[in-house]
């Protein structure tokens, strides 16, 4: 896998299911009280996003200014996910279960954990099941419903693409 160490007691990483410009997403598993497995997705966003970003910032600003800028970015990301609370329960929007902000040992960065329901991406679903015309129409209607809900809450998605469209498992 990679060198990511999970800091969520009771949960274990099953696999990395995706990565993008804002972070990585892992499939998690936890035993429920009856011995069954409960699965979730965990998005991990690191601030700064890379050693390169860290080094470039350190070249152009003081450590104090860098820490303040990074903290501001963490607060911005955290605020975006708090906004998703207004959308919780909408049938066409992924539910975010909880969020944690984990400081790095050097106090010059953070990992943001966002635990959410585990869903199947549209490309994975289509390759496994295919889609007929009525499926495509329903998908379009569901997407419009989700985007309308976002608009009503002044939320702009900024990254709509097939890999960010999900289907219930």
Please give the residue ranges for each predicted region:
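AlphaC helix of the eukaryotic protein kinase fold
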Residues: 58-86
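Activation segment signature within eukaryotic-like protein kinase domains
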Residues: 139-140
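Glycine-rich ATP phosphate-binding loop
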Residues: 27, 36-62
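Protein kinase glycine-rich loop
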Residues: 14-21, 25
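Catalytic-loop of the protein kinase fold
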Residues: 151-168
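AlphaC helix of the protein kinase catalytic domain
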Residues: 122-132
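Conserved short submotifs of the Hanks-type protein kinase catalytic core
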Residues: 107-121
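Short beta-strand micro-motifs within the conserved protein kinase catalytic domain, predominantly
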Residues: 95-110
